Amino acid sequence: MSKIFMIRKLQENDIDIVMKIWLDTNIKTHNYIDSSYWIENYNYVKDAILNSEVYVYVDNSTLCGFIGLSNNTIEGIFVKSDMQSKGIGKMLLDYVKNLKDNLFLNVYQKNTYALKFYQREGFSIQSQQVDVSTNEIEYIMLWKC
C-alpha cells in the first residue's frame, strides 16, 4: 500500500473489478455458505451496486476495495485478499462515518473477524436474526456519531 491513494465514488467502469472482489471475498470469508449462493446472486448484486452509494479505495490506480451503502445501512466492506489487514477497510469505514450520523449493518455471527472489526470501530450489537436466504444467524449492529 502506497501513500498515493484515494477514496472516490464508484464509476461504471469499476464494476467488473468490484464484482470480482465481491465474489472472491464472499467465497473466501463465508466458507460456511456454499459458493453457489454467491454465484447465483452475482447479477442481482451487480445491479444493486450500480444503483447504490458505493465508494472505492484506489491505490496507485489499482482498485483495492469498496464499501456499499443503502441510505444509512452498510451493505458490505470488501477488500482484495492480498490487500487485507492493511487498514483499507478502516479507511473506507471512516470515510462513510464522516458522511453519516449513524450507520447500521448486518454481519454473520460466524464471521468473527468482521464482528471484532466492527466492535473495535464502535459498532454495537442491537439484535440478531436468521438470514432466511442462508439460514445463518446474523447480528444487526449500530454505530452512532
Each language-model region and where it sits:
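Conserved GNAT-fold acetyl-CoA-binding loop/helix
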Residues: M19-K46
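Conserved acetyl-CoA-binding loop of GNAT-fold acetyltransferases
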Residues: Q119-Q129
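A short, internal acetyl-CoA/4′-phosphopantetheine-binding micro-motif in the GNAT/acyltransferase core
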Residues: T73-Q84, Y108
